[in-house]
Amino acid sequence: MGIVVGALIVLAYNAYSQKRNMLRVQYGDWRKLNLILDQIDKNYVDTINVGKVTDAAITAALAELDPHSVYMPPVELTEAETDLAGNFDGIGIQFNVPNDTAIVLEVIPGGPSEKVGLQKGDRILKVGDKDIAGVKFPQDSMVRRMKGPAGTKVTVTVGRGNETIPFEITRGKIPMHCVDASFMINDTTGYIKLSKFSRTTFTEFSQASATLLGEGMKKLIFDLRDNTGGYFDQALLLCDMFLKKGDEIVYMQGLHRKKDDYKADGKGILQDIDLTVLINESTASSSEIFAGAIQDNDRGLIIGRRSFGKGLVQEPVYFSDGSGVRLTVARFYTPSGRCIQKPYSEDYQYDIYKRYADGEMYDADSIKVDSTAAYKTVAGRTVYGGGGIIPDVFVPVDTTRATKFYIACNKKATQMRFASAMFDKYKSRLSEIDNDAELGIFLDRMNIPSAFREYASSKDGITCTQKEWEETSEYLLPQLRALVGRYSKLGENAFYKMYLNVDVTLKKAIESD
């Protein structure tokens, strides 16, 4: 039997050897992929989804390059580009999902939802004919159901008090803001929080900074923590606002891309403003271009923790079916000549966890630097390449507040649900408040400490001793006030103003005056 089987195998091999040799002559390395997909389509034993196989093949091929060269199917590509476009077609609300029901956090002024009467604090029960409340409906699926071409209609059913109210909403163009907050911390210090580098970043930042200048700003704290990047040109425009004429911002170079230098034009309105930039382990890409340019030109102070370490530039390649590839075409280099791209490795995506394990998040001395990648700033200070921007002033992760009570509340999102419950209770009053002093007085009257402890106990079964509450409340109370204050007319500005009381990195920046 063994001999017979062996003979059959040899026969099967020889039967196609001539055709295989012929095919070998007809294709080179880069045509193999097309050829094998064609052969699968024509000759595979079972019916298959060729598109699915093609997508998998492209994804596998790009995985051999670098972590940021990626294939994106049509839906994913559309969502990614919409996120950076500065606007999208939808109904015009912001919401969060503190438990299993979406709560309207913001109704965009002048948007479709405001026009029909949706209100902050409404609970979203249905979108179209689909129940989305109480069923742990995926948040990205909620967003997809609410979005759609401008001019189309969707019915959104909300819960308001004891009422269930359906609203027919005609979708429209909705602005997506990248400046999350902008305000004066004191008489001379302004603060701007930027969430991403979108198409509208330069416009939004210019408007915010002009307002702060008019209010007496002499120093700016620019918060790029958790900003994962976006459009390269927007980072250049922001650098231009701070740097003097001829200062180098960045240069790019790749095997098939000649060296491109980018220098400041000297027309920026913030050249004489003291600057502090806040970064952390999730500050990446275009944010690192900005931070690197400021650091290498000795233009400002970088405070926080080592940034992500993405020093690669991608260009889009679009296909007719709506899918596309983001292909790495160059590396970018800061003015001193350093590339801040961290090494590729099998555990690349787990680098942040490794930093925690190695102690880097708690101790500046644990930051691993490559002594062979040392460079000099304009003033002669030593900086390092090879893995993110290392801040001038290190601020560790604060672990002193992690009591059992606080951790238990975080796991169940008790704080967010409490804030939503407080808004339901005090909706008419909170919705009217539009100044900081009035909001502070109202929050004091709400007796948040006892209200929260009662809520945590009755809703989530989480209790604490008086001693544990005292250890926790110094950090937890400002957070609760910020979450409730966000429901006022002051919105995100109220949140960040109140939260800065427990933001150790921001406190360090203020102290650096």
Q: What kind of feature is each model-predicted range?
A:
Residues C339-I340, Y344-D513:
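Conserved functional hotspot residues or short segments at active or partner-binding sites
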Residues A56, H68-E106:
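PDZ/PDZ-like peptide-tail recognition elements
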Residues I48-L65:
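An acidic helix/loop motif centered on a single conserved Asp/Glu
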Residues S286, D298, R305, G309-A373:
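Polar, glycine-rich mid-to-C-terminal structural blocks
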Residues A7, S17-D29, L33, L37-V45, ...:
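Cleft-lining beta-strand/loop regions that shape enzyme active-site pockets
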Residues M1-N14:
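Hydrophobic membrane-insertion alpha-helices, especially the h-region
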